[in-house]
């Protein structure tokens, strides 16, 4: 017995302790529930309204204070506003904490109300209440509500997910436990609250592990209802759009009955008014990726009206392990086209790589044949030589089926592993003996392929350049150039040519490597499928097609070239975020799943989410049998077919879980040969999913499914199937993750139903080959395991679980490394998106500009004071800030840097305010006249502003400009400049960060940590980007002046929403067009069919056509 087991015996395990602490709270809920049952329907709803009013009344004073401060801040000087905004931020935090304390206090009563509402719907076909305005609105859109006179009639049946359901569910006690956990409760706090003590805590997140069939969806209604009462927004996150739509319709009436609004973002187009309204609902359902993409789209919006999301308040994630662990490695990306087109390289070099792979296959097959011959001899030296050839064959083509079969013979695998250990000694010092004879070397565990000199020779062929695919040593080549007796200009020319050659060769080598990976590591119908002439990735966890997802770094193009389908264009990232960092933005985060305990460490390390295991409502009586091990995959599949036939004859439904489309189709063909009727559910047939799952619990039904993880629909047994022994689960191999195996097992034995599960495995399975080889091989040899035999032992199960732990640890390392890289980007993203949001909304834009001016002044002072360069300072101040130095050269040399910064900053602020006042004074009379004469005709107007180099035609709302005494013009101009500058700088920065991420990986060859280099270099890139952007923005704003002097204001078309229809949209890719475009004055600007909200033009010359559209020359019109 290990130490943790000893502790558990004395103190109970963690989940038991958590549940013991929650139990008194559950008892209090049940006590209130017994009294709530006696209330009338109207009294029940009335109590909910009273609690919602209480939540708003308690924070009324704070909200009024915020309104007062927002009025005050407009009257303050720009530099004095920061203190007030900080005070507003603190009050908003106080509001959230105050509401949270109230929610904790009323939680028992609210849970009792929800439970009793569920009971009333379950026990009554209709529920009659006094109609409210909300009821009348519902009756217009939903069939389950009708209005008769002053009464609203709620029915207990409605449509959800395309099927009519009759409500028949009432919360079990275990679901109350789950609801408490999902509300993000610290159980100890509740005991203190119940006893009347004050208790404050920092809000944490919790995950409720609830077994399949235990009603996670119903349990979530408790915390969702409670938190929605604040009207701050609750997001219920699912893994696919079918579940989000179904659950919103299924649980919606429970919430709507009490006046809470419910919507689903997946029912509406991105960036539409309907989707915006969905986010304004009290409860919003949606898929994880759509929530993430809406966040990215909001941070590409050009008008406040384009924003759809509110603040990230509280989210409950269904199948949380699938979202936060399985999907966490894939970032969400919005991207656009790049100028570079290297797609043809994949087609150009495809035939060379195909030839190389075929040559290697022939070589490794011959090596295997020769190895078998030598190893059959009794001579020890010949045997040793045979092992060397066997290991070489393995390094060249580890997935060779003949090799895999031979390695399953007694003693062979163990002998090869010892040979591998010998050549790996002293950091692979002797490995060249094995690899030099190959054309390339495959590392299946790390998914890498490395070319050898022989491989390069084959690829080069008859090329004139023997080093066509060899990267030169730049350091050595640069040194050789420096030593040549030529001019400095000739040296520079040679260096440029060398760099161009290096870049071209890098691209070629990269293309070859990606093609080799595509041919050797990624198999069709396993990692991907080809549908409609497109390569589509299959999710290894769920078996679903990952619509729109593409492998990065050119790998997807390589697979497309391999499969001879159209190669889609490469893209450049415009906006990106990982699901890890998106969901960490929520103030409160909770999750539910049937399998979280094995990943509890990762949930805590990355998300600070604590896992609590909720007991089942009824004891699980499923029979989980020991794994059955076979020598070869052929024997295993034959045994599976026999097992299916036996179970079917007993009248039991059978669910066969496979890990790939290929295996599901293989088993399907084998069953067809035996004339066994069955259903197949895999990535190619996902449209029939709901129908197939609904039939899977009928007696004698056979269902083959690719990884049932996250299917979201319970398999309900017929009476005959239950009597026959329940659902039988057959796993065709162990998955890399224990969670996926547990999810498959969990499909059987729901709510106390009978059932069984067993996994069939072979020595040829990927998991066994790569991670369980040595221990299993020893076990096989000791037992004298022969072909055709089956092994069942607890020791085998333990060995397999240890192998799975190895894989899980490796995958966790990958995810954590990804997060460490993205954390660098995340801190930068937060700065940029916060500044962009301030510019878009406009409330804090003035404060941000003041801070930017200070940063620019500080940067200029530091740059020139270090060298006592007064002339340089003078030139830069005029160029960037449009001011003369407020100090003499003598003062510049003697003044401290901090004092100098303050003096120049104060002068810049004075000039900035004066410039803005000049614009207002010039334009105000024209605005007054326009408002009187055409105010009822024009809605938007254009007031061009120029910085002397470009014209910014910004559209303004005429009434708003008039009401603000033309100061709205200043704010809108600032907003236009800021948004365009931020977007341009951020896109370029993302491109540079992508390039940096790729380049720093080479640091590992120099025994340096790529992440450390990435952090240092990315900080410098970000600092330079901010400095450049600040100078560009401030330079434009400091020089801004009204362009029209003798012309009245013109009408503009209304501001348009960001048109996402122009973008190329995929699940993780989106193409965006530019927002502000410069136009030369020589182009015809007389006819403007559409006036965009923001547009930039170069300065118009005297003899150019006037931009006002009069047809006259500029000098005779508006000059």
Swiss-Prot record:
GO BP terms: intracellular protein transmembrane transport; protein import; protein targeting; protein transport by the Sec complex
A Pfam short name: P-loop_SecA
Cofactor: Zn(2+)
Residues the record lists as binding ATP: 175, 213-217, 714
Example of a GO MF term: ATP binding
Gene3D superfamilies reported for this sequence: Helical scaffold and wing domains of SecA (1.10.3060.10), P-loop containing nucleotide triphosphate hydrolases (3.40.50.300), SecA, preprotein cross-linking domain (3.90.1440.10)
Stored PROSITE patterns: SECA (PS01312), SECA_MOTOR_DEAD (PS51196)
Catalytic activity, reaction form: ATP + H2O + cellular proteinSide 1 = ADP + phosphate + cellular proteinSide 2
Cofactor: how bound: May bind 1 zinc ion per subunit.
EC numbers for this chain: 7.4.2.8
InterPro entries reported in the protein's UniProt record: Helicase_ATP-bd (IPR014001), Helicase_C-like (IPR001650), P-loop_NTPase (IPR027417), SEC_C_motif (IPR004027), SecA (IPR000185), SecA_CS (IPR020937), SecA_DEAD (IPR011115), SecA_motor_DEAD (IPR014018)
Keyword line: ATP-binding, Cell inner membrane, Cell membrane, Cytoplasm, Membrane, Metal-binding, Nucleotide-binding, Protein transport, Translocase, Translocation, Transport, Zinc
Annotated Zn(2+) binding sites: 1106, 1108, 1117-1118
Compartment(s): Cell inner membrane; Cytoplasm
Topology of the protein relative to the lipid bilayer: Peripheral membrane protein
Annotated Gene Ontology cellular component terms: cell envelope Sec protein transport complex; cytosol; plasma membrane
The protein's assembly and partners: Monomer and homodimer. Part of the essential Sec protein translocation apparatus which comprises SecA, SecYEG and auxiliary proteins SecDF. Other proteins may also be involved.
Family from the record: Belongs to the SecA family.
Protein's job: Part of the Sec protein translocase complex. Interacts with the SecYEG preprotein conducting channel. Has a central role in coupling the hydrolysis of ATP to the transfer of proteins into and across the cell membrane, serving as an ATP-driven molecular motor driving the stepwise translocation of polypeptide chains across the membrane.
Protein name: Protein translocase subunit SecA
Organism from which the protein derives: Azobacteroides pseudotrichonymphae genomovar. CFP2
